[in-house]
Amino acid sequence: MSENHKLSYVRNIGIGAHIDAGKTTTTERILYYTGVSYSIGEVHDGTTVMDYMKQERDRGITIQSAATTCHWIKKDDCAEQASQKEQEYKINIIDTPGHVDFTIEVGRALRVLDGMIAVFDGVAGVEPQSETVWRQADKYAVPRICFVNKMDRMGADFFRCVQMMKDRLGTKPLVIQLPIGIEDTFKGVIDLVKMKAIVWSNEDLGAKYEYHSIPNNMQAMVEDYRHQLLETVVEVDEEIFNSYVSNEDLSEEDIRKCIRKGAISGLFVPVLCGSAFKNKGVQTLLDAVVDYLPSPNDVNSIKAVDVKTEQEISRKVSVDEQFSALAFKVINDPFVGSLTFIRIYSGKLQTGSTVINTTKNQKERISRMLLMHANNRKDIKEAVAGDIVALTGLKSTTTGDTICSLDSQIILEKIEFPKPVIELAVEPKTPADQEKISAALVKLAAEDPSLVFTVDSETNQMVIKGMGELHLEIIIDRMKEEFKVEANVGAPRVAYRETITQSYTVDYTHKKQTGGAGQFARVKIIFEPLEAGAGFQFESKIVGGAIPKEFIPGVEKGLEEIKESGVVAGYPTIDFKATLIDGSFHEVDSSVLAFEIAAKNAFKEGITKAGPKLLGPIMKVEVISPNEYMGDIIGDLNSRSGVIQSMEPRGNTQIINAYVPLGQMFGYVSTLRSLSQGRAQYSMVFSHYEQVSRSIAEKIQAKDKK
């Protein structure tokens, strides 16, 4: 079998969902049934394989995305083909966090994966972080299958969950399984492709399951959903569609072919159900992974930029192409040092070879290559297109960098990282810890690009910035546990932003004469507002040599640096465009540095007169509460400047959706616990930036002046 043909038996998948929907439990069952683990790890016992960090086991949540490889042979194939090695599917899995503070782990995993299992809580349905993960998967056009988990739990409702997928995610769910029984009577599923009931044994941890006839009391419902399934899937294949409208019977193979085609193209999303904790539905989920999620061969080609020509090109995902890979994660391993995880898109990589990091134009030698299983590792000598492996000892490569062969240099599309929304002041407990803290934060920031730390040049105060209170709490904890350094921590602060509301043109001349060579640069720049989320854009419209070409990068660099300290309260300025339209230079006194300084001063003058405003992060908050506490909870949200969007009944509880400024949400968990006697729960995700009120802006400015 050729190497490229073998790729059709590879699946690179992620498992993602809202916190507590059962992602890690589902992954642990997959590892057990595929033979990777000999016992089932449980989140509540702290015995999971994939959650191996101390902080993960202490809190019962996933913090880092953990990678593992397993192999699966479909039950249908076992009798005839178990002895044929090529029928064994290799599944590379990344289990990702569900907590909003660790969204970056989901984003960078999806960037390098070919497919995803979206796990939903059968009771709660589509939750806020489910929506965030879904949007991230949409961004990278990752095909998905859905697994409605916890069907054994009180209040589980498969059909309501499917409807929520339509309403909240805007997707087209394709039901391919129906649950048999509800809550504590749940015992299996109806397979709408095979048209058989599948029932799991309770005696052997769900390792065995049997096919039965469809129960009589479900016949009508099954026929209805089977009809909907066929009506939807035949649309993707003209030949099969013609057979269907001619009333010819469709084979299971025909139906699977159509489902696969539609799922990979994103026309619909297959939906399955089960209970991972009760060991029901996981094997059929694995069958769906190999049946309906893409192999690396289905990706066809990837977009890249040719280093020599600077032109966009396509490179085929093939072992026969030159080597290229994307680094998507760096971690510090206590035994082997720095580990760089890569996804190989084309060609082969062997230990001992030399490659180039085209992002940084630095050569790297591959001294050791590892196949990872959570925090365990296996040395390998070669990896090929489609593989996800870890490399040790890379000197220059960080998250988002491209590495490739020396003979054919390309740069792959980078990974985008979210901007921090919260910050903490940290200081060493002893003067001797100052350098230790800096060294620890450098290593932690290399692992986690959503962590930013800065040192104030005047006060020498260190500030760490991240995605939420839990995110920064984990960072402080890891500094103590892994780097043996403790810090005093200040109160959390909101990471505000600044923007402008009108256009302004500034003509600024920088002139300095101190004897000998002087400095001269004149720039004329238009500053104008952009739509939310547009970031910063720079354009040069210089013609006729008013400013020599070699000085223009100095203008852009000056603006890039100065925009990080806005004119309102010193926060980064976002969502604006700077257009360089004119200027002048001096043959002797002009330099890149002079134009850099001129641009910075032009920014200060121009932004000040362009209607600068302060922006604060707005969070999308979902509160689930028993009915009797609704009045107090809504009153409290209103007092926090919250805007109630909707209230939705669910049994004896209400779901409140609201937008609330992040600055008003500190300490909310204890307030909610007090208001509801510990019975309500909430989750929040970042939504957007919004102009803060004048009173809050004045308070922030007053603090900034102190």
Swiss-Prot record:
Subcellular location: Cytoplasm
GO cellular component: cytoplasm
InterPro entries: EF-G-like_DII, EFG_II, EFG_III, EFG_III/V, EFG_IV, EFG_V, EFG_V-like, G_TR_CS
One Pfam family cited in the UniProt record for this chain: EFG_C
Entry binding sites for GTP: 17-24, 95-99, 149-152
Presence of keyword Nucleotide-binding: yes
PROSITE patterns: G_TR_1, G_TR_2
SMART domains: EFG_C, EFG_IV
Gene Ontology MF, one: GTP binding
Domain tr-type G, chain residue ranges per copy: 8-297
Keywords annotated in UniProt: Cytoplasm, Elongation factor, GTP-binding, Nucleotide-binding, Protein biosynthesis
Assigned protein family: Belongs to the TRAFAC class translation factor GTPase superfamily. Classic translation factor GTPase family. EF-G/EF-2 subfamily.
HAMAP family (alphabetical): EF_G_EF_2_B (MF_00054_B)
Function: Catalyzes the GTP-dependent ribosomal translocation step during translation elongation. During this step, the ribosome changes from the pre-translocational (PRE) to the post-translocational (POST) state as the newly formed A-site-bound peptidyl-tRNA and P-site-bound deacylated tRNA move to the P and E sites, respectively. Catalyzes the coordinated movement of the two tRNA molecules, the mRNA and conformational changes in the ribosome.
The protein's name in its UniProt record: Elongation factor G
